[in-house]
Amino acid sequence: MNSHYENKRFRRKALCTSIALGLLSTPFYASAQQDPEVEEVVVTGSYIRRSEGIIAASPITSLTADDITDQGTLNMAQIVQNMTFNNGSGVTNSIQASGASSNGAAFNLRGLGTRATLQLIDGKRVTNSNVQWLMPSIAIQRLDIVTDGAAALYGTDAVAGVINMLPYKTYEGLKIEHFNEEDSRGDFRDQTTSFLWGKALGSDVDLVVAGSFRHNGTLEWADRPKLMLAGLTDNNGANPTNWNVPQRDDSGALLGTTAKTADPICGTDPITDPTVQGGNKFGTLAFGSCWFPFGDTRDFVEQKTQASLYSNISWEVNEDLALSSQLLWGRWQGHGRQNQGNPGTRFADLSTVRGEIPGNPFRAMSGDGRELFAQPKLDGAGMILSDPFGNQQPLRNGAGAVVLASNQFTNLANDPNGGVPFNEDVPFSGQYLPFGLANTLPQAFDSDDISRKENDERDMRLSFTADFTVPYLDGWEGTSTYSYGEHSVVSAQTQHFSFSAVEQGLNCDVVNDASACFNPFGAADASPYRNSQAIADAIYTRDRIDNKDILQTFDFVINGDISPGGFELPGGAIGAAFGYQRRDETDQNVPTTHQQQNDRLNSIAALPTKFSRNSDSFFAEFSFPILANLEVSASVRDEQFSSGQGDVVSKFGITYSPTDWATLRATQGEAFIVPSLNQLNSPEGCGLSNVDDLFTSFSGFITSCKSGNRALVSETADSFSVGVDLTPIDGLDIHLTYSETDFSDRIVDTTTQDIIRADFAAFQGSSGFVATDANPLPSISQLTAWVNNPLSDPRIQRDPLDITSPTRIDRSDTNASSMLVKSWDIQANYNFDLDAIGFGSWGDFRASLNATYADTYTWQEAPDKPVREAKGHQNNSFGAVPIIPEWRANASLGWSLGNHSISATVRYIDEVMFDANEFSFQQYLRPENLWTTTDVIRAWTQTDMFYTYSDLEVYGGNATLSLGARNLFDREAQKTGMIAGVVSQIQSPLGRMIYARVNYEF
């Protein structure tokens, strides 16, 4: 995308015009006027102390502890998703390109990516942006959200804005709270117990401690059968699977070619309903292929347990020095369900499955369909060798090929020139999946034969702060902080398999040690060819990784007034802040033992890595009170990294209050994001990714491997905002903000579909291929020629024996995208009581509206790609952009009288054009399917409501009881053909959620 020079000139002109108008139209206020003494505080978005309640140039949204309570959930991911200016977050799993998950959520302001939003706790950086368990929600006193660029103050990452969770540092008493929520169908429950305790230890020490414990159960896909049956529940990678079976001519001679053939046991289970646990154990046979049903193994919300702890101790040593220490600790353990194995193996490195392997079902046949027989293999006594199952062994020549009998069409029992029956040697295909219900499963699987995840992540941050009076500088104050943060992942890798164990099982002695053989084919429950338990357990590995991110920061900030020789501007003294920050980052990755030994079936070897870097930053901020009601601010920051990245960025702002009920504000700034250590250096990691192959009819999961890219450069952005804040009458405040972000060199995690799409476009440009009704897809010869063309993308790997099946796509982050985002935010709040207008004392009412209008969201994948409009689209096939509805809005009405209060909120998300793969073929897989075509994801409206009774005196303390419901009218999510059957970024499959909250303070 070309730089938006005209927009930049407009922004500068608008800012300068605002300043000039303020200077020309503002009446002069005498400097001798004395204002009453007010408390000064440092607020998010500035390091300069200001009068409490003053309006800043940057748009800031603040949520108090009560506001967070009114959201009706302790799940911070849900609170994030509810914000109108946040896009791309989710609270349920979908296995879609969006990456929506019930296990983690981070702020994604304006949909510019989670790394474009800087997340702080108490003004300090954290190593993990997952808001679900960073700290107990009961400990959050306020949540500040700055919705424009702030890198000039906070450094890298603050492109779209800054999130600052501000915890309690003083508290007196003990508050205990229990929160329970469950869906009205009784399928899901989520419970949290938390406490907050604080005490003043004498006159100069304050101690606050808070903790929470949360556990939620599982919401399975099968608990929402309408959605599940509408969405994709089968994958082309399977077990039983499709094999590349050798082809022969009519005489029985090998032709050197293979034909994709489904395992004969596929599709023989009479239970075809995917919602039935353990059904479809032999797969689904359709379109000549075997498909793997996985819907009964997946969850919308995975079972997990979270614990978090917060503590803060403050000591006011004297009037010039205060010391404090703060501890954050959290742990998350997840036990989600998943299918028994995933497709994508080192199939080309595996030995061919010999025909002698017990259970091989592919009887050797001539081209015209006649059974073939081989010369028998004899022992030293001239007897025909047989395995323990009575299968006679064929003779092989020096090249390892089976030697056909003289009369290859007759059994030796009927003709002395005949031979023994034999099966074909079949190589593995890229669609092979190591485990399924059709053979023996590892003992580590649960009793329901489902693989359970063992996620285990831990976070901690310890910080020490000194607040002091700056010597020799009258009125100046300073803050110095050291923080040590650590995020560790010691999760078990529960879909990993031993390459050597499979190889050993394939190369077993079928005559003398058949129990050591590995049968990769399907086998009925009573079959003698089922693998032994020892074989299954040897192949399945459950090693743990040991990854660790460490962040150490040292901050030094001083702030005060500059008035050389007593000089002051008409509005007062110039405010200033100067600071320095040192950051040391370490990224340590320790793969599983099997992966270090190159013994993982799913990926290549990976060795432990450890990368570090540091950065030094200097910044300055100034506030120029030109007049009593006109202020201009400026800030600049120089941040340089030892890894070679860095930038010098600035930001300017203005606030102008022509009356006491109106304030105009504007900002213009620069921002940047340096690549993370993981983006630069991460070793190869492989997982599962869904792909729709544009060259063939293949649709399903394949292996997707990602590694670091050391060629990445910093992302850069220019931002502009202008707004007005109005308080025209008592109790009413209105805020309108226009914001614009011009983002370039965006680091994009290219999806597998991005890569396939780009490769297909290159193929069309090279070959001139145009799809028609008669030929909707390229021919096999065209595809083969393209794969051999140096212009094709080498990151796409295909099965050499079945070129129509992609098996693996390699990817990495790239500086490949630019974006221009323009939006409007509207906030209005009105508090009133009917008594004031003569209707009697019916209590206090409060009404609020929060809305975001996406004016435009244009983006470009790469300089040679077209500019696209993301607004109003699902954007499912593009990894760079989330769903961008044109409108999002929340409207609330609350009432309180005495101890009673009621609040209702209506949430609205605009419709968007559906553009994901619908997997239309699934409508033919089974009769239970509810697939329907989709062109628009309809607008989503839900109503949340709660009732609270507060200050109930119980045993010397006060109790508060709340009952409420989210999605009160049980709005059902729209069915789509996507995986999971729901667009989980903007619509929830949970249905009506009923909750109760009780807290007790004393």
What are these regions (language model features)?
Residues 2-84, 194, 198-199, 319, ...:
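N-terminal Sec signal peptide and the immediately downstream disordered periplasmic leader
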Residues 34-36, 170-173, 202-204, 318-321, ...:
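Short loop/turn motifs that connect adjacent beta-strands in outer-membrane beta-barrel proteins
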Residues 76-79, 105-108, 157-178, 193:
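N-terminal periplasmic accessory domains that precede
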Residues 80-122:
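Extracytoplasmic beta-strand/coil segments of soluble accessory domains associated
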Residues 124-149:
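Short acidic/polar hinge/loop motifs at secondary-structure boundaries
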Residues 229-232, 268-304, 320-615, 669, ...:
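Surface-exposed, low-complexity loop segments enriched in small/polar and acidic residues
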Residues 687, 845-953:
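C-terminal beta-barrel architecture of Gram-negative outer-membrane proteins
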Residues 742-744, 855-858, 905-923, 949-1002:
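C-terminal beta-signal and adjacent terminal beta-strands/loops
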